[in-house]
Amino acid sequence: NNAGVMAPPFLKTYENLEMTFGVNYIGYYLLTNKIMPVLRDVSGSRVINISSIAHYRVNGINWDNINSQIHYNKHEAYDLSNLFRIMFTVELEQKLRQKNYQTIAISCHPGVTITNICRHIPMAKVLQNNSIFAKIINKLVFHTPHQAAMSALMATTSLSVKGGDFVGLDTK
């Protein structure tokens, strides 16, 4: 699962869910449950949920405001959606073990990378130009998309990764 939006203005999905919550969490949940009948009995199969260390910034959950424009903060919505992804992965892993399915579930952080997911963040636009300043900052601070893909590749193929793990760049 690698769908995601980051810091869009307040929008709702067709299903009337706040966009970040709907895409980043509910989308993962629905896709995973749709394909689970195929995966669960395949030895070595894995559900890899791309997430982020942004979940560490969550400082409580306002359950009354999950789907509301009132007090909406686009950065908090992103952080919270990543926490929900990781909680979903841990819960999924527990259920897979209880039912003795062959599939494992893993959360994966690709590292801090400037890609199109950052399109709603003004500073990211500055860092995507070809100026000397942008090139230096990008080299010193951010991972390339190629480097970011390595964490998903590790989650997909490494024998040392166990179900329920949170792996990736900047995590272990």
Residue spans of the language-model regions?
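C-terminal helical subdomain
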Residues: 107, 131-172
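Rossmann-fold NAD(P)H-dependent dehydrogenase/reductase core
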Residues: 1-127
